[in-house]
Amino acid sequence: MSVYGLQRLYIGGGYVDATSGKTFDTFDPATGDLLAQVQQASAADVDRAIASAQEGQREWAAMTAMQRSRILRRAVELLRERNDELAALETRDTGKPIAETLAVDIVTGADVIEYYAGLATAIEGLQVPLRADSFVYTRREPLGVCAGIGAWNYPIQIACWKTAPALAAGNAMVFKPSEVTPLSALKLAEIYTEAGVPAGVFNVVQGDGSVGALLTGHPDIAKVSFTGGVETGKKVMSLAGASSLKEVTMELGGKSPLIVFDDADLDRAADIAVTANFFSSGQVCTNGTRVFVHRSIKDAFTQKVLERVKRIRVGKPTDADTNFGPLVSAAQLDKVLGFIESGKAEGAKLLAGGTRLTEGHFANGQYVAPTVFGDCRDDMKIVREEIFGPVMSILEFESEDEVIARANDTHYGLAAGVVTENLSRAHRTIHRLEAGICWINTWGESPAEMPVGGYKQSGVGRENGITTLEHYTRIKSVQVELGRYNPVF
């Protein structure tokens, strides 16, 4: 018997049964326990969700911006009131430590909704004078029905990130969470309904990539916001364009460089590197997995990193003291272990971890020890490809120009960071790095006010920040003639 029972679709302000007759299972990655059976959406269900969203969107867009703002603020209040309950669910579904989900996942998701609730009333057009008796004005109008496709590493946070600007601008959204972590998006739907969001404005359809493809290719979807891998992102972009030239926002993979210069505070640098590789068991798209360290300090830096890795508390995610949990699934565990074996085979020096943890309460979970490789080269698979797990690669460098060139030698461009006491060098280096999200002497924070997204094959568009709100609107230009019309013929 499952912990949470049968999970249905959420369409039109309530739960409905899928018509496919199919279900899939979701498991607790720490214990292997069956959490729920989830109904898979059919093409007819996707059509129903979009039709419901169209109806709800008309009502939602007809409200004043202040009315929408108040409703979204109420949703924020409900999220914060239920933080502990939602964090417990997210921990069971993802395997993240409860200390992490309590402090980050729902908290930051609510912050983003609050941010856009505040901006809803600031959506404005322009007035452009042409001459004494004629002018142009513009309106920013909602796109209509948007699709959100989430990833498995931050299920409820991603759902908040995608819905907040869309709803603030007067759109509706049909959201498909990852089939690996499908539970918390349904709770967000309940909260939106309770807060007063009209029925249909936020619908949740469940299923695998085929359901995402139905959304992406649907002619009545105006925009797709996708978070996931590069190859899937390319398919999303292709289908979105081929179907109806719909707009896309995509936050894709990364293989981000962290550069530690020779004047860095080594304790600070080691703390940053460990956070940038092992937070959330390394399952973060912006992880700084390519750690470039100046040759003169590499040994001392490496020692400090290893000291900190020994202090990581791997354990049951539900224990308050745990700060490192399992990987999200058996498939992800196999993938990460495969990369570790590749690192060994290509000559990287294993300095810590490198094994699956199977003793005691780890036996049925998807645990891999925090792993550090030294003596890495740029051409190694573990250095070039996204692992999405707790595997750090340490590389040495000698000059600023050299490390910048090597850091940029990738088709990814999501994030980058530098650690140095020389702020001139910090800014100079950051300005030359080909990455959309950069940090100086820190790592990982992505507040609501900060636009996040990638360069190159790490994404298209941005999430969070004022710019994102604008991209959930379309501009209508209107010329007004107050004087005499001069006919052409």
Curated annotation (Swiss-Prot):
Share an example GO biological-process annotation for this protein.
glycine betaine biosynthetic process from choline
Where does the entry annotate site (Seems to be a necessary countercharge to the potassium cations)? 247
Per the record's keyword annotation, is Secreted included, yes or no?
Answer: no
Q: Which cofactors does it use?
A: K(+)
Name the residues that bind K(+) 1.
26, 93, 180
Binding-site residues for K(+) 2, renumbered to this chain: 245, 456, 459
Residues at which NAD(+) binds: 150-152, 176-179, 229-232, 253, 285, 386
Per its record, the protein catalyses: betaine aldehyde + NAD(+) + H2O = glycine betaine + NADH + 2 H(+)
Functionally, this protein is described as follows: Involved in the biosynthesis of the osmoprotectant glycine betaine. Catalyzes the irreversible oxidation of betaine aldehyde to the corresponding acid.
The name under which this protein is listed is: Betaine aldehyde dehydrogenase
> What is the native source organism of this protein?
Burkholderia multivorans (strain ATCC 17616 / 249)
The organism's taxonomy opens as: Bacteria, Pseudomonadati, Pseudomonadota, Betaproteobacteria, Burkholderiales
